[in-house]
Amino acid sequence: MKKMLAAALAASMVMGLTACGGSQTADTKAPESAKEADSTVAGESTETAGSDAQKTGSEMTWKLATDAAKDYPTTKALVKFADEVYEKSNGRIAIDVYESSILGDEVSYMEQLQAGTVDVAKLSLGTLSGLYEDTQVFLLPFLFKNNTEMWKVLEGEVGTTVKNGLNDYSIQGIGFTDNGSRCFYTTTEVDSLDDFKGLAIRVQNNQLMNSMVSCLGGNPVNVSANEVYSALQTGVCKGGENNPNIILSDSLYEVAPYVLMDNHVTTMDVICMNLDLWDSLSDEDKEIVNEAMADATAYDREIWDDSVAESIQTLKDKGATIVEPDDATLDSFREAMAPVYEEYSAKYGDLLDAINEALGK
């Protein structure tokens, strides 16, 4: 089946040549785990929403899957979504939130979402772009200056296009949550373009991300997310990139104590529902879902920036060196990565044009 094969490709993509002439080796390890870029961490327990509703016999009980931990901002927002749906439906709809990859890694529960055995799921761009390739455009370096720009785009026609574009894969997008701005963490201090030359940098097994590192002069390395710490210890890689929350929670600062706050990619997660379930809902219930998701997104935006600020301060307290690049350095990064834009502008030109139009560029 075409749609399910597309999902499988997310786990087994083999990358070719990059825009800057480097090459990649497909990650043959286990699929990316909760620690993946896409900004999640492993946790321990399941947060159940609407449990009282189940006791009194809710008409519907949905499974919601995420690989994020219970105390991660995204999970807190998803629990709020579940609570809001339960309240707004007067207990007719209960949602069980299965966090910390209890239902499998993202690739696994994305397939379950398509099959209808999972009803709602949080999907990161690293996983989703293996299925819905157009979403890879959001991984372009420096596409957004900050998350304010990102939200401006997602709240308009572009966001609607992305959510509805998933229909071809038996999925309906229902909203977005913040996934932060990514920074480089390294074993030696990096504060200029020259410092990247020949440096082995771990990135997700994603063609665009590999191209980005190659353009900086580094060597992209693809290892499983749960092996990054040991890869840094053994010298397989000399750095990686993620948001400060993950750098802290995965203790990566212990073996790569230099954090370059370049914010080269600002990303989101997409909250998705099985398309058959969505189509089966009444207009009233669709409105309940939309309103609950809007409330959850607002809550996510409220707590995300504070969580990042707290993580940065904790990294400093634990001895990490936070490097703040100046404008000239950031300009040199943008110039070096121009070939990435050239390649992907041709590939995803229409969506990129819509993003730039929304930003007034």
Model region roles, listed by residue range:
Residues 21-29, 41, 50-148, 166-361:
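N-terminal secretory/targeting leader peptides
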Residues 16-19:
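C-terminal motif of bacterial Sec signal peptides marking the signal peptidase cleavage site
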